From Swiss-Prot:
It comes from the Bacteria. This is Probable spore germination protein GerPD. Keywords: Germination, Sporulation. Induction: Expression is sigma K-dependent and negatively regulated by GerE. InterPro entries: Spore_germination_GerPD_prd. It comes from Bacillus cereus.
């Protein structure tokens, strides 16, 4: 897929999310190249359902 988005003077004030999957990518900013991959080499019997890693909600602001 080729996607070209031009955002001039994009300023993000606040973001609210209801949920994020364990294989999600959330990006604000510029990126020339993104390569995402995933592999599951665990036997299916050992996979548990539910949240694997708690989401970090208290993220410090970036300086500047």
């Amino acid at each position: 897929m080729n996607l070209n988005v031009v955002n001039r003077e994009l300023k993000v004030g606040q973001i609210k999310m209801n949920g994020v999957s364990s294989s999600a990518l959330f990006l604000i900013g510029d990126a020339n190249l993104l390569i995402l991959s995933s592999i599951l080499d665990t036997p299916f019997e050992t996979v548990t359902e539910g949240p694997f890693v708690p989401l970090v909600t208290d993220v410090p602001p970036t300086p500047g």
